[in-house]
Amino acid sequence: ELVKAKKIDASLLEGKNEKYLMTVVSAPLNGVNEALVIAGSDKRGTIYGIYELSEQIGVSPWYDWADVPVMPRQNLSMMRGSYTAGEPAVKYRGIFLNDEAPCLTGWVKHTYGTNYGDHRFYARVFELILRLRGNFMWPAMWGWSFYADDPENSKTAHEMGIIMGTSHHEPMARNHQEWVRKRSEYGAWDYASNQQVIDRFFREGMERAADTEDLITIGMRGDGDTPMGGKEGEDDKYVPRDEENMRLMEKIFRNQRHIIKEVTGKAPEKR
């Protein structure tokens, strides 16, 4: 309605990515003489505008995680006009919760009583990322499974506007713990000898992620984040097979791209 009434210039937002516009508008609604309006080109754009205002009035993005005090204010004022930070220069901006044990896992256990990161924990991380104008995260992976531990995790990411991905060791939107916990059923994490089962594992991941913004990692590592063909804890016994592994990796790439296209109906590079 504000756009139709020409109180907001839609051309400043149309076709833009994650851009917000903060502007003072006269008579935006009946009975309202003047208002500060925050509009976004998309969901994250609007979120960034809200958090920009929050930061401008004295709420640090680190108010929660670093206990930065929020200073009380009796009055707030804003100059009339429009303000925007423009579009982000980098498309994906986020963090990887790496080497999370024992510090972070212990804190989560103490705070939430769980042996995994649930949606309550991740919501606090997501808020920090958004307040820092980020949009992306790789979840912790040592003993946790973002997708399997709490079905609300992925839903919370979507609702809050966070794009999820997975690390170098977790291809096709699957957490390695999902394999580890069913190793007796699935068999070896070895594409050369167990391709059919692994392809099904990959396909299930894509089916689960098909309607999300998740950024899909492709490729494959050895079991336990070892080189292809290696075994966890036995790095000293590993014998490099570079040529063989490169041929196998090329096959994995082809098959993963085929699965992505088949499940989503989109070219892999456009997923």
Protein language model features and the residues they cover:
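Flexible loop/turn segments at secondary-structure boundaries
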Residues: 44-46, 102-105, 136-139, 143-150, ...
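An acidic-aromatic substrate-binding cleft motif
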Residues: 60-115, 120-140
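Gly/Pro-rich turn-and-neighbor structural signature
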Residues: 69-79, 142, 148-159, 183-271
